[in-house]
Amino acid sequence: MHKNLFDHVNTRPEAIHLPDGTNPDAADACAKYNDIIHSVGGIDLQLLGLGPNGHIGFNEPGEAFELETHCVDLTQETIEANKRFFDGNVDLVPKQAYTMGIKTIMQARKVLMVVNGTSKAEIVKKAFFGPVTPEVPASILQMHPDFTLVGDEEALSLI
């Protein structure tokens, strides 16, 4: 997050909060992260991408919409998609991750999703013009009062 985002934006270090990946107790790390979010009054802007199976964050298909930050087992598809961050070596990709839950994402005041490429066209159509279902986690964003989808022509070609 620092290398790809925080080092490139004008933000105070004390305003940056991430789940503590060094905490051996996943439930405690997630609870503390949720406490931080609540203590600062929630999230103003949630920036999201869209996974090939409709996941947002690491909320994979089938995850309950009512969850806050929690630890998840990553699907093989998500592991494969993230190997690019590990020099292409799938064996180096973690098999679990902390993720902000759908409940917390939906409580953000504004949600912005950025999509690009033809590989996202079908899932964009399914997520935003299909039924709201846990099988396509991003579909819940149809219900958000202030959601914006930004994408290139290819990603938006089917809508």
Spans of model-derived segments:
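ATP/nucleoside-binding phosphotransfer catalytic cores, i.e., glycine-rich phosphate-binding loops
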Residues: 103, 107-159
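Short, flexible loop segments at the rims of nucleotide/cofactor-binding pockets, characterized by
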Residues: 23-25, 88-94, 127-129
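Solvent-exposed alpha-helices and their adjacent loops that cap or buttress functional pockets
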Residues: 9-11, 37-41, 65, 97, ...
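A glycine-rich beta-strand to alpha-helix segment
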Residues: 35-63
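Ligand-binding beta-strand-loop-alpha-helix segment within the catalytic cores
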Residues: 1-45
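Class I SAM-dependent methyltransferase SAM-binding "motif I" and its flanking Rossmann-like core
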Residues: 57-102
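A short secondary-structure junction signal
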Residues: 28-31, 57-62, 67-68, 123-127
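Short beta-strand segments
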Residues: 19-20, 47-50, 113-116, 150
